[in-house]
Amino acid sequence: MPQPSFMAPGALVRAAASAFVLAAASSAVLAQGTAYVSSEKDNALTMIDLATLAVKGTIPTCKRARHIQLTPERQIMVACTDSNQADLIDPASGKSVRRIALGDEPEAFDLSPDGKVIYVSNEDAGEASFIDTASGKKLRSVKVGAEPEGVKVSADGKTLYVTSEVASLVHVIDTATGKVVKNIKAGKRPRRMAITPDGKELWITNELGASVSIVSTATHEVIDTLKFEVKGARAEDITPVGIQMTSDGKRAFVGLGRANHVAFIDVASRKVGSLVLVGKRAWNVTLDKAQARLYVVNGLSDDVTVVDVAGAKAIKSVPVGRVPYGLVIVE
């Protein structure tokens, strides 16, 4: 008969302490930091504590806060469409430190890798503007298709991609010359983009095409199209917009708009693995640093759905400002 094994009291204490530390460390991965959510109607950012998943305050900003992004200096930059400005906010103090003119109707932007240039889509003018971050001066404007929105810069900073919603095009712009070098025919009403970490593919969400166009960055040709289906949802309600990839490039997450779901996609096979029910009009999506939780901004239910990535399950809905648009995380 096997003899029972016993752990010495000291070893038992050490094991328990070790388990506690590991559990605390695991929890800390999820618990540190703050999510900042822009709101189109409240002219403010809502702050969500990542430890408690509770709202801990708001920060006033300029009018109709939309696209939001971290600068290389870890400041928060938010485009305010009705103020024609970017608001630069210091997360440590929670205060605006500077406002930068972005031209008429700025909706989305991206930053050069060094943060020295802001590339912004000006919807009414049908232009992409290059803004010097330090001086706030416009360096140039590039004429693009009607209603430009999504803006994405390549990792080397040499190529700028801008979507045109009306023309169903993605314009490929040389950042050194400001010249449009190619127009890519995407799906209907292209909105946002993600570049795979290896730089080889550009993924474009097509809001009215219920799809993602996949483009080779070597040839700037569409090489595949991923179509979405959601059981019980009308085809016209499947309106993909926000997209983000994991740092290893293996998975992509897409907010499916009025279908009220977020899609988990295997990048290699280009197949949807899971569909997670979230709030109304799932718009933009953001992963935390550990890539353990996905934060989904829901524009019509005025909340953020927190999704456990491993379990592909919504774990909490956090009420935020009216018509929330984008979200960044400072950890």
For each predicted feature, which ranges?
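Bacterial N-terminal signal peptides that target proteins for export
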Residues: 2-17
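Predominantly soluble domains enriched in secretory-pathway, periplasmic, or organellar proteins
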Residues: 6, 10, 24-331
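Cleavable N-terminal signal peptides
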Residues: 18-19, 29
